[in-house]
């Protein structure tokens, strides 16, 4: 009997034994750094001379792994493999497919600290952030497995005399998964196993920044009994194979999480019908945000500061849900900023393999340079009240940074930075708080800190984001509890980790029989 879904608990690192276990996992992973990793096509491991070099962003002289790069010919072979695997995989019952995911979840759970340690090296995640990433991956495995078993039952329809109607789901066919680097296990896992448990083979092209941890997921699913050809691992340079994967006539869906620019490019290209294509491609896209926490005059100001600081600076602001803007009622504006600065001063910045580090590096030199440039923009547009320091001598470190007195239309109030930078702006009324909150092209997450029920009720419908939180931060959605996805240019509102997600990878079919 399968128990009801319940999210994976987070590790309490105040417990000495847990700290020791994580340190042991870090030591184990460190011994494995620098290895070569293959492509995986139809179960065959293929090593190439041309490789992605994955480095530790907190120690850029440390190579995490060398991952083989796929060519267009490899992509063709992977599609051939996926189409052949589809013939059998689609006929597996949902329960049998779900068992693969249950076994995979059990494998990861037994080795939880090991996977988290890989995230500390491959993605620069501090202990708690890495632990949460791994736990979320387990949640996706458990949640989607259960949900597919329910979906296989179909949906009830009305019947007429002498007529029977059935409504059920069938998989689409081979598709492409293009996940991000910031949740290098959780989102890679969720975006991959959702279409797989729905019956679709997948070509997985991981981020070039974090391909090693993605390969570890491939190993787990293979160990869990996933048939060859159902998951084909094809890392590579986006400029060389990205468009080719999206354009391919045999691509039935693209499951993408990443930047607005790449998401829009995928949308534009995927709508074009290629020679030999016999279907319309499904597009699932989560494309980032410019997320706002608003604070009215009735709010608990300590809670407001805590919500802003932890939402802005957790994992160095490298979350699409991160608080990048704080819009505060003018009567409490100065006090909220003062409390936020004092709290930010307590945050530790350092190597993520060390205990009690709150923030580590950002992911690479390009992102470091981008954030550094935005800090200079912020100095021109507002007043720097805390932070702004950067250091890329050993790793790509950016300290928590707070600006105040921004015009709501300023660049750092409108453009996604994806780093530890938060900008404060003031408003005279709740109407203006909402107007500013809604004045970007994004609509992913937001939060309202208020003790005014009327204001909270208004925000529920008028704050135009896919995930809205009251009296807490705007990050840390949990699978099955807060399905995740946004409005406007934040994406297709696919609600990952929710009851509607798997239908993106299924066709609904109706069969009517007359007696």
UniProtKB/Swiss-Prot annotation:
Pathway: Amino-acid degradation; L-proline degradation into L-glutamate; L-glutamate from L-proline: step 2/2. Keywords: NAD, Oxidoreductase. Coiled coil: none annotated. Its EC number is 1.2.1.88. One of its GO terms (molecular function) is 1-pyrroline-5-carboxylate dehydrogenase activity. It catalyses: L-glutamate 5-semialdehyde + NAD(+) + H2O = L-glutamate + NADH + 2 H(+). The active site is at 286, 320. GO terms for biological process: glutamate biosynthetic process; proline catabolic process to glutamate. GO terms for cellular component: cytoplasmic side of plasma membrane. It comes from the Bacteria. Belongs to the aldehyde dehydrogenase family. RocA subfamily. PANTHER family: DELTA-1-PYRROLINE-5-CARBOXYLATE DEHYDROGENASE 1, ISOFORM A-RELATED (PTHR42862), DELTA-1-PYRROLINE-5-CARBOXYLATE DEHYDROGENASE 2, ISOFORM A-RELATED (PTHR42862:SF1). This is 1-pyrroline-5-carboxylate dehydrogenase. It comes from Oceanobacillus iheyensis (strain DSM 14371 / CIP 107618 / JCM 11309 / KCTC 3954 / HTE831). The lineage of its organism: Bacteria, Bacillati, Bacillota, Bacilli, Bacillales. The gene is rocA.
């Amino acid at each position: 009997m399968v128990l009801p879904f319940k999210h994976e608990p987070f590790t309490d690192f105040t417990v000495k034994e847990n700290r020791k276990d994580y340190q042991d996992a870090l030591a184990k992973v460190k011994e494995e750094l620098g290895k070569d990793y293959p492509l995986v096509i139809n179960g065959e491991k293929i090593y190439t001379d041309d490789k992605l070099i994955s480095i530790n962003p907190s120690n850029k002289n440390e190579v995490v792994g060398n991952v083989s790069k796929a060519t267009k010919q490899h992509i063709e072979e992977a599609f051939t493999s996926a189409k052949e695997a589809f013939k059998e995989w689609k006929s597996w019952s949902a329960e049998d497919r779900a068992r693969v995911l249950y076994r995979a979840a059990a494998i990861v759970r037994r080795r939880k600290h090991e996977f988290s340690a890989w995230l500390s090296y491959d993605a620069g995640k501090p202990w708690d952030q890495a632990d949460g990433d791994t736990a979320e991956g387990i949640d996706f495995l458990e949640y989607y497995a259960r949900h597919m078993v329910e979906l296989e039952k179909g949906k009830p329809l009305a019947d007429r005399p002498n007529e029977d109607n059935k409504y059920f789901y069938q998989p689409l066919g081979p598709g492409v998964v293009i996940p991000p680097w910031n949740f290098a296990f959780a989102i890679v896992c969720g975006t991959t196993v959702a279409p797989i448990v729905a019956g679709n083979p997948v070509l997985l092209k991981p981020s070039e920044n974090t391909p090693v941890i993605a390969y570890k997921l491939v190993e787990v699913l293979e160990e869990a009994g996933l048939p060859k050809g159902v998951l084909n691992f094809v890392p590579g340079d986006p400029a060389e194979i990205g468009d080719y994967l999206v354009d391919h006539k045999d691509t039935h869906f693209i499951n993408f999480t990443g930047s607005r620019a790449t998401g829009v490019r995928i949308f534009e290209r995927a709508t074009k019908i290629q020679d030999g294509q016999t279907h319309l491609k499904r597009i699932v896209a989560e494309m980032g945000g410019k997320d706002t926490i608003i604070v009215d005059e009735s709010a608990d100001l300590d809670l407001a500061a805590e919500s802003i600081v932890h939402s802005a600076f957790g994992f160095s602001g490298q979350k699409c849900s991160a608080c990048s803007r704080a819009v505060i009622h003018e009567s409490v504006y100065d006090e909220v900023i003062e409390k936020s600065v004092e709290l930010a001063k307590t945050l530790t910045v350092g190597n993520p393999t060390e205990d009690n580090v709150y923030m580590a590096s950002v992911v690479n030199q390009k992102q470091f340079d981008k954030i550094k440039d935005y800090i200079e923009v912020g100095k021109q547009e507002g007043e720097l009240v805390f932070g702004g320091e950067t250091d890329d001598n050993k790793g790509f470190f950016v300290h928590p940074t707070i600006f105040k007195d921004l015009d709501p239309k300023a660049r750092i109030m409108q453009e996604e930075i994806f780093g530890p930078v938060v900008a404060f702006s003031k408003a005279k009324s709740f109407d203006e708080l909402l107007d500013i909150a809604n004045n970007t092209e994004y609509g992913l997450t937001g939060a309202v800190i208020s003790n005014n029920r009327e204001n909270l009720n208004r925000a529920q419908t008028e704050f135009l984001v896919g995930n809205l939180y009251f009296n807490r931060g705007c990050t840390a959605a949990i699978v099955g509890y807060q399905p995740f996805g946004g409005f406007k240019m934040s994406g297709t509102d696919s609600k990952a980790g929710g009851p509607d997600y798997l239908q993106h990878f299924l066709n609904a079919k109706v069969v009517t029989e007359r007696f």
